[in-house]
Structures are given as structure tokens and as C-alpha cells.
């Protein structure tokens, strides 16, 4: 909304959304241990890698929009926390330096044991890691010197790009069906991938692919993004001809994440063939909204009853 208002040179809306973003940041900082990523309190702290990595992405984007140094500092601190682990918490980090890819969690949350071969590597941490690394690549200074620390506080542009490429390739080899474009939910060791498709995982793979395409110009990344988008549109959305809904708290936001990365695919990469499907999804969901509140549900093909209880995640997609 801020970017749109700025592009339209609407000073009033630009100021409003900038202030709103600042309030959201301040509120979340107060809620989540002042963004101390080494605090593993299970109520207000950090206890799983993918949640931290989403803040890496959000904070890096905040820096990209507003140029606030604190956002970049916290974004890089959270990336370090996930990649290398925490000396305070005692986990060894999400990155598997022996076999590649990113582990999903540390266990137990208190006094954890090192991750081992066979522990889960989920799409929900691997592809967001690529998105985070490439977003930082796009925003850190050009002239940085490579740190010699074992657990560096920052990476150079080249290091962020290399890390993004490495994790992406692991994901392609282990989580992508190269024929259909379906993204597996996870893989444990050498076992078969868990071929349960989620709009969320399709979306982050699309986003990771586009960022690498824009950074390198290599067409294979764009081809992969199109393959995953086609599977989402033609296979996952076949029943109702609009984006599907997955029940459960938080899962309603999957389509909002998908929408963000599809906008990149359509407008930054010229793949306008998806516009009819996206417009149909929007039109269907909006037509079935609760018209008294102008609130949409997550099941776009169903009418939302007036006054029905709806979570913010499910309402966010349209």
C-alpha cells in the first residue's frame, strides 16, 4: 500500500502508510522480546527457524522501503541467528553444512540437541531463506569486506547471493517435481519427499525463483517460477477455478503470499497469462464478501455470512 501510494504521488496516503508501518514495527518489537532473536521464550520469543526467517524478509523489505538502519541491522541479525544458530540457546543452526538445505526446527526448544541426518527440512524454511538472502543481497552495501568471524554479523552481497543459490539448488533437487511444478512440503534424510502441496510453498518457490532470475538473468529460474505457478493455477485450483483454501489458523494467509509473488511474475517478468485467473479469484472472493463490513473469507467460492467470525489471515488474501 505504501509503495502504491508513493508511486501515485499521494502524499497523504504515503504519510499514513509510513506511520502505520512504524507502528506495526514498534508493536511487534515490544511483543517479541525487542527482537532479541536469542530469546527462546515460547510465548513471546523465538522457537522455530521459519518464523525468524520471515522477520528477516520483512525487516529487509522495511529497510528497502524506508532506509531505516535499524531494520537492516535486525534483518541481518535474524539471518545470522537462523543460519549459524545461537550460542545462548545452544542450537547449531538451520543450515546443514554437511548435506545442504535448511532444517526446520531445533529440539528440544530448551537445551537443544544438534540436528542430525534425517531431521526434517521443510519447504517453508528453505525457500523463504532464499527470498531472505536475495532481499538482503539487493540491499546491503557494495563495498563490504568479507568477515573472518566464525559466526559473522553480516554477509557481503556475493555471500548472500551464494547462500541463496545454494539453498535454492538443494530445494530444486529435493522438493521440486520438475515435471509438474509441484513443491513437496518436506523431506527427511534420503526418504521420499512429502508430496503434499500448499499454496504457501508454491508461492515462496515462485518468489525465490524470480529473485534469482532478476539477480542473474538466468532463464531457468524464470522457467521454474512459471512451472510452479502453472501447477498452482491449473492443478491446485482446478475444483473451483479460484485459489484453494486450507483450513486452520494462519493458513488463510497462503493466498496473500502467493498474490505478492505472482505480482512479481506478472508485472516484473511479463507473464500476463495469469491475469485472467487472478482477476477471477479476486472477483469471486469480493462478490462473496460480507457486504456489511466489506470483509472477505478464505473460501472465495463461498458467501461469507453477515457478521461471521473471520480471522485476519483468512481475510487478507483478497
Language-model features: where?
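Short clusters of hydrophobic/aromatic residues that line enzyme substrate/ligand-binding pockets
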Residues: 102-104, 183, 243
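Well-ordered alpha-helical scaffold segments within catalytic/enzyme domains
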Residues: 1-13, 54-69, 128-155, 204-218, ...
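Noncatalytic carbohydrate-binding groove/subsite architecture in carbohydrate-active enzymes
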Residues: 127-128, 132-196, 203, 208-211, ...
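Alpha-helical scaffold segments in carbohydrate-active enzymes
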Residues: 23, 27, 61, 74-88, ...
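Aromatic- and glycine-enriched pocket-lining scaffold segments that form the walls
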Residues: 72-170
Amino acid at each position: 500500500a505504501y509503495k502504491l501510494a508513493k508511486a501515485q504521488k499521494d502524499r497523504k496516503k504515503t504519510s499514513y502508510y509510513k506511520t502505520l508501518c512504524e507502528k506495526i514495527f514498534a508493536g511487534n518489537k515490544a511483543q517479541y522480546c525487542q527482537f532479541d532473536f536469542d530469546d527462546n521464550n515460547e510465548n513471546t520469543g523465538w522457537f522455530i527457524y521459519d518464523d525468524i526467517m520471515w522477520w528477516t524478509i520483512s525487516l529487509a523489505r522495511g529497510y528497502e522501503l524506508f532506509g531505516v538502519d535499524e531494520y537492516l541491522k535486525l534483518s541481518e541479525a535474524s539471518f545470522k541467528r537462523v543460519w549459524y544458530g545461537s550460542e545462548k540457546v545452544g542450537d547449531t543452526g538451520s543450515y546443514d553444512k554437511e548435506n545442504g538445505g535448511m532444517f526446520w526446527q531445533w529440539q528440544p526448544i530448551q537445551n537443544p540437541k544438534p540436528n542430525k541426518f534425517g531431521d526434517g527440512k521443510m519447504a517453508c524454511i528453505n525457500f523463504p531463506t532464499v527470498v531472505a538472502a536475495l532481499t538482503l543481497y539487493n540491499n546491503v552495501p557494495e563495498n563490504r569486506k568479507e568477515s573472518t568471524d566464525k559466526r559473522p554479523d553480516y554477509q557481503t552481497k556475493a555471500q548472500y547471493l551464494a547462500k541463496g543459490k545454494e539453498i535454492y539448488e538443494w530445494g530444486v533437487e529435493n522438493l521440486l517435481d520438475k515435471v509438474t511444478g509441484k513443491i513437496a512440503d518436506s523431506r527427511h534424510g534420503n526418504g521420499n519427499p512429502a508430496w503434499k502441496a500448499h499454496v504457501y510453498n508454491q508461492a515462496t518457490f515462485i518468489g525465490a525463483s524470480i529473485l534469482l532470475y532478476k539477480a542473474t538473468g538466468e532463464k531457468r529460474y524464470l522457467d521454474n517460477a512459471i512451472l510452479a505457478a502453472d501447477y498452482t493455477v491449473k492443478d491446485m485450483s482446478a475444483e473451483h477455478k479460484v485459489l484453494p483454501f486450507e483450513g486452520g489458523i494462519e493458513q488463510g494467509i497462503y493466498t496473500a503470499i502467493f498474490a505478492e509473488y505472482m505480482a512479481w511474475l506478472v508485472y516484473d517478468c511479463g507473464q500476463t497469462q495469469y491475469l485472467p485467473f487472478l482477476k477471477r479469484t479476486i472477483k469471486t472472493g469480493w462478490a462473496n464478501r460480507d457486504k456489511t463490513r466489506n470483509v472477505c473469507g478464505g473460501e472465495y467460492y463461498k458467501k461469507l455470512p453477515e457478521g461471521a467470525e473471520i480471522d485476519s489471515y483468512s481475510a487478507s488474501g483478497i
